A protein has these predicted regions:
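Nucleotide-sugar donor-binding catalytic core of glycosyltransferases
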Residues: 2-251
Length: 251
């Protein structure tokens, strides 16, 4: 049952990604069409979460989510903005329930990547404290976290190494996933298998890309292309790691 629920959440995440790309939350939610996800070998998986899944969205103080965005709207367009739009999508989703007693899953909207530097890079150093504070509040105000120790809760942690909350891999691995999150389900963009920052049951989703930028670059499928594969090569932190040893792994 839990694996089916995780699959449905994955479908919901895919639905959200489709909503983000097409730029219309209302149209998708009103139509309730069955979502289709292409699989290998042309297989198609079909699942409609409406009526099969109930998600309770915790009403947390604005300091954990909307206030950082109001302070710095750049959070709406960077690659980790998925945490914002998943929250917005769920608030008006048909799977949302206002009765926590009938919920299958509990979602805690904590924006851990909205503390940006002057150049627009998220600084996750305060994210563990922020997450622990939110979970402490949830455990004090509602009985559901303590009832399951977080097993039926999910969080969106879209940073470089997910809930390890560090942009340097060596330090992220040394830190590991925040202990208080180790029984919860994590929805994250980091998806490297057999890595300490990706635990079993995590759901991997693509990074966020502003819809208007994607749509501006769309080409008809039959358009001749001069580039088949683009390899970015050495991507590095010029200030802290000019050789690209930890960020690009020396590639």
């Amino acid at each position: 049952m839990k694996m089916r629920s995780i699959f449905v959440i994955a479908i919901l995440a895919a639905t959200t990604a489709a909503v983000l790309f097409h730029g219309s939350v209302v149209d998708v939610q009103q139509s309730h069409h069955t979502e289709r996800i292409s699989g290998t070998g042309g297989d198609v998986l079909e699942e409609d979460p409406v009526g099969k899944l109930k998600v309770y969205v915790y009403d947390l103080p604005a300091k954990y989510n909307t206030k950082p965005v109001e302070k710095d709207p750049r959070c709406l367009t960077h690659m980790f903005a998925t945490e914002i739009f998943v929250h917005r999508s769920l608030l008006s989703s048909a799977v949302r329930t206002l009765d926590p007693e009938e919920a299958d899953w509990f979602y805690a909207p904590v924006y851990t990547t909205c503390d940006l530097t002057a150049s627009g890079h998220p600084m996750p150093f305060d994210s563990p404290r922020m997450m622990r504070s939110a979970i402490r509040l949830i455990a004090e105000r509602w009985p559901y976290w303590n009832r399951s120790e977080g097993v039926d809760h999910f969080f969106v942690t879209p940073h470089d190494f997910g809930a390890c909350f560090h942009f340097q891999e060596e330090k992220a691995m040394a830190r590991g996933i925040l202990p208080v999150l180790r029984r919860a389900t994590l929805v994250q963009t980091f998806g490297q298998r057999n890595h300490v920052c990706l635990k079993d049951g995590s759901i991997t989703i693509p990074p966020y890309a502003p819809p208007w930028k994607m749509e501006a670059q769309l080409l008809p499928p039959a358009t001749p292309r001069s580039i088949f594969v683009y390899f970015r090569g050495l991507f590095y932190d010029a200030g802290n790691d000019p050789e690209g040893g930890y960020y690009a792994r020396g590639a």
